[in-house]
Every structure is written in C-alpha cells, then in structure tokens.
C-alpha cells in the first residue's frame, strides 16, 4: 500500500517511536487543543528511509496520503481485515503507573510476502498467551488511536466522530475501504473456507498472545498496532454501524466537551469488545462446522473413489466369469445330454426286465390256481362217488330188513304172545315203582321247607 505515516506519534509528550518501544500516557487526553512541540525519529525500512521532520505549533497537522487500496492475501484474510479495522479502542482507561514495552521480532506479513517487525506485549495481564488483560490490550489500542488522530487530521473542515477528529476525504476513503474489505473477505471465505480457518486461527492466536506491531511493507514504512480484533469484518453489522457514525459526523454532530467524549468512547468500546467476543464465538462455531462438513465430504469422496475402483476392477473379472460360465455351461449341457441318453436306455432295459418278471409271476400264479382247481375238482368227484355208494348201500339194507319182518310175521303168532305179555308186565312194574319214588321225594321236600306249627298250650 502506498502510505506514508510519521515516524512517531506524540500525544502530550508521549510518543510511539519506530524502534519498538511504546510508553502509554498517564492520563487520557483528547485532540483538538493547541499543539505542543513534537519531534520525530527516522526509521529505516526495507524500501528506504524517511527523513525526520519537525511538527509545528497550533493548527499545523499532518496530512494523510491517499491509499490506493488494501492488498489482501488469500492465505490470511483475517490478518488483513484486522489491520483495516481501527475504531473504538481509545475508550478504555489504562492504570497510569503501568507501561507496555514492545520488543520487535521478525514475523511473516500476509501481503505479498513482505517481512516486518512484529512487536509482542509483555504485560502481567497476558497469561500463557491466551488469556489477555482487556485493559492492557485496549490501552495499546488507545495509544494507536491517538496516533491515528494526529496523522489523520487536516487544516480544512473537521468532523467529530466518536471522539476522533477526521477529515471528509479520510472518512470517504475509510468507508470505501471497509466495504471493499468486507466484500473481499466474504468472497474468499466462500471460496476457501479451509485456508481462511487456518489463517484465522493463526492470526487470532498470534495477535491474541502478542498484540503485534508490524513495521515495513515493500520499502514503505507502515507502522501499525494490530490488536486482538476477534470478530473481524465478518460482522457486517459493525461495518454498517461505523459507516453510520461517519455519516452522522458529516451532518455536523459535534461534541466540544472532552470529558463527555472520553465517557462515550469508554462505553462504546466496551460494547464493541462484547460484540467482538460474541462474533468470535459465532465465527468459531461456523468455521468448525465447515471443517467438519469438508472432512465428511473428503471421506465420502474417498469412499466413492474406492467404490469406483472396485467396480472397475470387478468388471473384467465379471466378464471373464461370464465367459467361463458360458463355456462351462456348454460343456455341462453336452454332458447332461449324454447322461440323459444313458439314463433313458437304462430305464428302457429296466422296463423290459420288469415286464418279463411280471409275466413270469403271472404265469406262476396261473399255474398255481390251475393246480388248486384241479385238486378241488378231484375231491368233488370223490365225494360224489362216496355219496352214490352210501345211498346204494342203505337202500340194499332197507330191503333186507323188510324181508325179515315179513318173514317173522308169517311165522306162528301163539308162541310169541307169551313173550309179548311178559315184556309188557315188566314195563308196567318199572313205571309204577318210578311213580312211587317220585311222590315220596316230593313230599319229603315239602315237609322240609314248610315251617313247623307251634301250638300254644295253656298251663
């Protein structure tokens, strides 16, 4: 950037020289009064040297050279954005007995690889480089704001903005720079969120622990005090608020009372600090979510590549398998056809053997049945013959008996009468004895089963 800044900025006898040592003022004072004799030292930069000049008394002020525009590095958008923000740091009151010493160290600058000196803060308020004392850090910002006020005023019409005296041209340039920086930052964050995350963390941690003061860019002396701006230009509301404050200053809102300026700046800076802390927390969450999403996308891309490789490697194997399957299926079909033919031939032979066996079984059964039938017919014939023989024998016997009776009847009947009478007497006697015995037995049974009669004889 084409910019010329005085060697040192004085405020009531206190200066911020270019050798890296800064002594804060004991009391806070506002500009706008009668100037005091001031001196400046020459500081060498990589591009050349600026001769020391002497500032006069009264209304003689330094004139700021117009900037061409901020040079941004894509690798560190947060550092450039934090360098462009120079507002609201003059209100916090630093204890009067404390001094902040800056020791210059070499560090990398984000714009086009320039190398300058980065001044680190040595103060009890900073613990382990990550828990700074707010009063300490913003006291350094107060000194830097006062140097800005000394270098930013012109002899012509002045505007009072938040306790600072700025010119109309500077105000217009400042608003344009803020808009350009916010637009460029939004584009870079959209295109490269990962690189912006790395640069944000690197710049925020380094500035948070050191409170750096960078000097020198392409041979031009550019002394800046880079404070712990956490929210950066990501919060568009702060940019709009700053532009509105500058526009109100153009309308003529002026405050002449120095004490009221200090109080207003004090509370405004406290609000800015709270807003910056909130915006930093939101920014951290958003960036962390973006990192997680990019990690997931990377994993998905790796999985997709692996799947495509597997598919591409599996395709020739599938083709080979198909060819092998086709050849093997053809040979298998031939083998199966031969097996089917053999099985059909065996089946025909088995059928023929079965038919022969069935015929043999049927013949045996028929022969057996025939033999049984022959036996039955033979028995039948035998029985019929026996029957005929018996009938003939009976008939012959009857004829013989009839002949004998006839012969006995024809004999003498007187001799036979006595025999017949004797036989009839005997038969009658037997029948009579049997009747007597029967009656006696019946009587005995009746007497035995009948109850005995009991006669009552009076005495």
From Swiss-Prot:
<dbReference type="GO" id="GO:0031965">
    <property type="term" value="C:nuclear membrane"/>
</dbReference>
<feature type="compositionally biased region" description="Polar residues">
    <location>
        <begin position="308"/>
        <end position="319"/>
    </location>
</feature>
<keyword id="KW-0472">Membrane</keyword>
<keyword id="KW-0812">Transmembrane</keyword>
<feature type="compositionally biased region" description="Basic and acidic residues">
    <location>
        <begin position="67"/>
        <end position="78"/>
    </location>
</feature>
<feature type="short sequence motif" description="Nuclear localization signal 2">
    <location>
        <begin position="63"/>
        <end position="64"/>
    </location>
</feature>
<feature type="short sequence motif" description="Nuclear localization signal 3">
    <location>
        <begin position="86"/>
        <end position="87"/>
    </location>
</feature>
<feature type="region of interest" description="Disordered">
    <location>
        <begin position="1"/>
        <end position="78"/>
    </location>
</feature>
<dbReference type="InterPro" id="IPR044696">
    <property type="entry name" value="WIP1/2/3"/>
</dbReference>
<comment type="subunit">
    <text>Component of Ran complexes at least composed of WIT1 or WIT2, RANGAP1 or RANGAP2, and WIP1 or WIP2 or WIP3. Interacts with RANGAP1, WPP1/MAF1, and WPP2/MAF2. Interacts with SUN1 and SUN2. Core component of the LINC complex which is composed of inner nuclear membrane SUN domain-containing proteins coupled to outer nuclear membrane WIP and WIT proteins. The LINC complex also involves nucleoskeletal proteins CRWN/LINC and possibly KAKU4 and the cytoskeletal myosin KAKU1. Interacts with WIT2.</text>
</comment>
<comment type="function">
    <text>Mediates and enhances the nuclear envelope docking of RANGAP proteins mediated by WIT1 and WIT2 in the undifferentiated cells of root tips. As component of the SUN-WIP-WIT2-KAKU1 complex, mediates the transfer of cytoplasmic forces to the nuclear envelope (NE), leading to nuclear shape changes.</text>
</comment>
<dbReference type="GO" id="GO:0006997">
    <property type="term" value="P:nucleus organization"/>
</dbReference>
<feature type="short sequence motif" description="Nuclear localization signal 1">
    <location>
        <begin position="60"/>
        <end position="61"/>
    </location>
</feature>
<feature type="region of interest" description="Disordered">
    <location>
        <begin position="240"/>
        <end position="266"/>
    </location>
</feature>
<keyword id="KW-0539">Nucleus</keyword>
<feature type="compositionally biased region" description="Polar residues">
    <location>
        <begin position="1"/>
        <end position="17"/>
    </location>
</feature>
<feature type="transmembrane region" description="Helical">
    <location>
        <begin position="427"/>
        <end position="447"/>
    </location>
</feature>
<feature type="compositionally biased region" description="Basic and acidic residues">
    <location>
        <begin position="251"/>
        <end position="266"/>
    </location>
</feature>
<keyword id="KW-1133">Transmembrane helix</keyword>
<feature type="compositionally biased region" description="Basic residues">
    <location>
        <begin position="52"/>
        <end position="66"/>
    </location>
</feature>
<feature type="domain" description="KASH">
    <location>
        <begin position="426"/>
        <end position="459"/>
    </location>
</feature>
<feature type="coiled-coil region">
    <location>
        <begin position="331"/>
        <end position="375"/>
    </location>
</feature>
<protein>
    <recommendedName>
        <fullName>WPP domain-interacting protein 3</fullName>
    </recommendedName>
</protein>
<feature type="region of interest" description="Disordered">
    <location>
        <begin position="308"/>
        <end position="330"/>
    </location>
</feature>
<keyword id="KW-0175">Coiled coil</keyword>
<dbReference type="GO" id="GO:0005635">
    <property type="term" value="C:nuclear envelope"/>
</dbReference>
């Amino acid at each position: 950037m084409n910019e010329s800044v005085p060697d040192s900025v004085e405020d009531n006898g206190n200066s911020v020289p270019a050798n890296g040592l800064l002594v804060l003022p004991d009391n806070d004072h506002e500009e706008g009064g009668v100037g005091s004799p001031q001196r400046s030292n020459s500081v060498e930069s990589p591009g050349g040297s600026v001769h020391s000049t002497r500032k006069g008394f009264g209304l003689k002020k330094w004139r700021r050279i117009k900037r061409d525009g901020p040079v941004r590095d894509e690798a560190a958008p947060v550092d450039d954005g934090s360098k462009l923000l120079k507002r609201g740091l003059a209100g916090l009151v630093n204890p009067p007995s404390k001094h902040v010493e800056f020791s210059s160290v070499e560090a990398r600058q984000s714009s086009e690889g320039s190398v300058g000196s980065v001044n680190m803060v040595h103060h009890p308020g900073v613990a382990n480089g990550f828990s700074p004392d707010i009063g300490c850090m913003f006291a350094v910002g107060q000194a830097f704001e006062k140097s800005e006020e000394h270098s930013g005023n012109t002899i012509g019409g002045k505007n009072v903005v938040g306790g600072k005296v700025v010119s109309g041209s500077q105000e217009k340039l400042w608003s344009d720079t803020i808009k350009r920086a916010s637009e460029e930052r939004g584009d870079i964050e959209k295109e490269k969120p990962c690189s912006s995350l790395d640069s944000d963390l690197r710049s925020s941690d380094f500035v948070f622990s050191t409170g750096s003061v960078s000097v020198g860019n392409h041979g031009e002396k550019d002394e800046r005090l880079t404070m712990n701006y956490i929210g950066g230009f990501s919060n568009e509301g702060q940019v709009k608020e700053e532009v509105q404050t500058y526009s109100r200053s153009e309308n003529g809102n002026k405050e002449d009372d120095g004490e009221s300026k200090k109080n207003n700046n004090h509370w405004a800076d406290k609000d800015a600090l709270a807003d910056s802390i909130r915006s930093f927390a939101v920014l951290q969450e958003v960036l962390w979510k973006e990192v997680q999403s990019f990690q997931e996308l990377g994993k998905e891309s790796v999985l997709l590549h692996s799947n495509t490789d597997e598919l591409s490697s599996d395709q020739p194997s599938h083709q080979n398998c198909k060819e092998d399957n086709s050849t093997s299926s053809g040979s298998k079909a031939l083998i199966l056809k031969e097996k089917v033919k053999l099985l059909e031939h065996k089946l025909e032979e088995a059928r023929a053997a079965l038919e022969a066996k069935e015929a043999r079984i049927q013949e045996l059964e028929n022969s057996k049945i025939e033999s049984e039938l022959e036996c039955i017919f033979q028995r039948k014939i035998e029985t019929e013959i026996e029957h005929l023989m018996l009938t003939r024998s009976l008939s012959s016997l009857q004829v013989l008996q009839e002949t004998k009776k006839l012969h006995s009847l024809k004999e003498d009947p007187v001799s036979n009468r006595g025999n017949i009478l004797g036989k009839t007497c005997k038969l009658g006697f037997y029948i009579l004895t049997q009747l007597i015995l029967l009656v006696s037995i019946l009587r005995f049974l009746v007497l035995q089963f009948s109850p005995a009669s009991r006669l009552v004889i009076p005495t």
